[in-house]
């Protein structure tokens, strides 16, 4: 098992790749909320924990939180982010 951190910025359509978006625009969503991402991860059956009082490193003034997800070693970060995004549309 490996752990992965998911920030809402990773799937935010308003962000550019340089601003932290990790998925292609066709998978990105508008205004992703931590709770919505956590709900999708839960529906996917993945073990996770939520850290609410954390700031995204590129925007230390904004507290948005992140989710720590446990994944199989064969699962890629991009694969999981795309799956989460698809489930949010």
UniProtKB/Swiss-Prot annotation:
Compartment annotation: Cytoplasm
SUPFAM superfamilies (alphabetical): SRP19 (SSF69695)
Keyword presence, RNA-binding: yes
Pfam families: SRP19 (PF01922)
InterPro entries linked: Signal_recog_particle_SRP19 (IPR002778), SRP19-like_sf (IPR036521), SRP19_arc-type (IPR022938)
TM spans (from-to): none
Keywords, ordered alphabetically: Cytoplasm, Ribonucleoprotein, RNA-binding, Signal recognition particle
rRNA-binding listed as a keyword: no
Any Gene Ontology biological process: SRP-dependent cotranslational protein targeting to membrane, signal sequence recognition
Signal peptide from the UniProt entry: none
MF (Gene Ontology): 7S RNA binding
Gene Ontology CC annotations of this record: signal recognition particle
Any coiled-coil regions, as ranges: none
Gene3D superfamilies: Signal recognition particle, SRP19-like subunit (3.30.56.30)
Function, in words: Involved in targeting and insertion of nascent membrane proteins into the cytoplasmic membrane. Binds directly to 7S RNA and mediates binding of the 54 kDa subunit of the SRP.
Family note: Belongs to the SRP19 family.
Subunit structure: Part of the signal recognition particle protein translocation system, which is composed of SRP and FtsY. Archaeal SRP consists of a 7S RNA molecule of 300 nucleotides and two protein subunits: SRP54 and SRP19.
Protein name: Signal recognition particle 19 kDa protein
Annotated source species: Methanococcus maripaludis (strain C7 / ATCC BAA-1331)
Gene responsible for this protein: srp19
């Amino acid at each position: 098992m490996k752990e992965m951190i998911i920030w809402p910025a990773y799937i935010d359509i308003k962000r550019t790749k340089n601003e932290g978006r990790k998925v292609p625009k066709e998978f990105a969503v508008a205004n992703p909320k931590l709770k919505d991402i956590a709900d999708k991860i839960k529906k996917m059956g993945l073990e996770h924990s939520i850290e609410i009082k954390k700031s995204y490193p590129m925007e230390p003034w904004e507290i948005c939180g992140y989710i720590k997800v446990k994944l199989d070693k064969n699962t890629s970060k991009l694969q999981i982010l795309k799956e989460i995004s698809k489930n949010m549309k």
